[in-house]
Design a protein with these regions (language model features):
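Flexible "arm" and connector segments at domain edges
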Residues: 1-98
Length: 98
């Protein structure tokens, strides 16, 4: 991505934040998280081969990527007061220590 792409992306995110309520954005995030959980479950089923899905591995991976991007988009549109980088850093450090 170049600087122009980031500027356009930021403008689109601002548009969503101004025109879609916080409640609606949180509802969207919860729906996307549920779809992500289903996509991860199908991916795990395919990896384990215990209860495989009829979809191909490529389809499953593409679906997982799409759900990840849906969540990322929702997170990009979360209100600034919900973002706390101290918590982020603490969680990241804990993960590294494991």
């Amino acid at each position: 991505m170049n600087d122009k792409d980031f500027t356009e992306k930021d403008a689109k995110i601002r548009y969503v934040c101004v025109n879609v309520s916080s409640l609606s954005r949180l509802i969207q995030l919860s729906e996307e998280c549920a779809e992500y959980i289903q996509a991860v479950s199908k991916c795990l089923r395919t990896m384990s081969q215990d209860n495989p899905t009829p979809k191909s591995e490529k389809e499953i991976i593409e679906n997982l990527k799409e759900e990840i991007m849906n969540i990322q988009l929702c997170l990009d549109c979360i209100d600034a007061d919900m973002i706390d980088y101290k918590i982020y850093e603490r969680k990241l450090n804990r993960w590294v220590r494991r």
